[in-house]
Amino acid sequence: MREVPATVARVAADIALGSSDPIEARLRRALHASLGTVRRVDSLDEGSHTTHHRRAVVHLACGDRRSVFVKTPSRHPATRLLVEAAGLTASEVRFYRTLAQSVPVRVPECLHARHDGTRFMLVLEDLTGTDRLPAPTEACTARQALAVIDALADLHAYGWGRPERGRAGGWLLAQVDRERSLGTWLRLPLTRRGLELAGDQVPRSVAAGALRYARNHGIADRQLTGTPHTLIHNDCHIGNLAFGEEDQPLFLDWQMVRAGQWARDVAYFCTLALDPDDRRSGEDLLLDRYRRRLHAAGGPDLDAEEARDAYRRHAAYALEATIVTLAIGAAPRDATDAWLARATAAVDDLDSFAALNLPG
């Protein structure tokens, strides 16, 4: 895809140029339209993985104050280049500008969303104190899992068949193409690097399956990214969820949003957000619940056996995503350690690589 090298060139030039514009000044300009004149900005805490993020208190001229969550480009050049090449920040901004108000799931209130081709700023409500934000190493409770499965079914029913090329949602399909293009070059070396870092955390048989998956990415992609498509979150682990009253979920971090198969979200969530024993005992119940809810919400009536096979195949992607996350340092190590343990157990239990029928 020609836009990938063009994006890399633009971002590389911007990194070399640098920025002398303080975050406080940018926040004042960004929030003027939605909140009014900003008198002072107090930063609370900050961190950086795929993007740089901070919590801040904004003091307004009217005397009110508002706590916000701000996302800006990563301060690590290699991470920023990879994230922009994948179109992730542009996708999240586009989601909040075009879809956030219409999806049937809870998302943070957006106060500002802008991407200019090289830099971006996203300002969201700060959920601290209003919703529970689990640590990424935690596992969902049974009640939380049921609520997330219901919400995913509602989201997928809403988005079923919506992403179409040449239409307003065509960018969601373009993200599939971009992921496939980058995977051609990066999937195998990143898988090797991630497995090297994981060491004995990934059993040899599972590591061999992961490498076979990476070498045969074209065959795997045809099975995992083909039609029918719906709108998927595409990164639904517990670190990207918050829970409100009665454990109703709120979905965070939409930078991976795209068109895709329903099983991508369901298998990813069950694989990475559930304790392996809970997943083993509850995944069939969750799958049946998902199918019934999807159909009741206006989606298709999925065949039970075909749904189970799709779920098995997509668990392999959850493992691949975790290995790649480890390779590029896109999450804290304690989080990737927890996800690796869950993902290796899932692909082993479900015989996921065999379900993909990949050549040796």
Which ranges hold each PLM region?
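Regulatory N- and C-terminal appendages and interdomain linkers associated
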Residues: 1-47, 59-65, 160-166, 208, ...
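Conserved NTP-binding catalytic cores of kinases and kinase-like/nucleotidyltransferase enzymes
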Residues: 1-119, 244-249, 359-360
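Active-site activation/catalytic loop segments of kinase-like enzymes and analogous catalytic loops
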Residues: 94, 256, 263-298, 315-336
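Conserved structural core of kinase catalytic domains
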Residues: 112-147
